Amino acid sequence: VADVIIEMKDYFVRYLKKGGILIISGIIEERMDEVIAAVESAGFSNPEPYVKEGWAAVKFTL
């Protein structure tokens, strides 16, 4: 799932308005930092990660 999210990061920007919220999930905890960096590089900010039992979800603001 991490690879798909990273590949789609630019699509998320196209379909959300400024100030919009993006929530992504199904990320293996070990790849969370990589996904956060990629999504931030597309213009999102304020990542709020949630981790449970090795899985992560992250909330971003555009």
Indicate residue ranges for each PLM-predicted region:
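S-adenosylmethionine
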Residues: 1-62
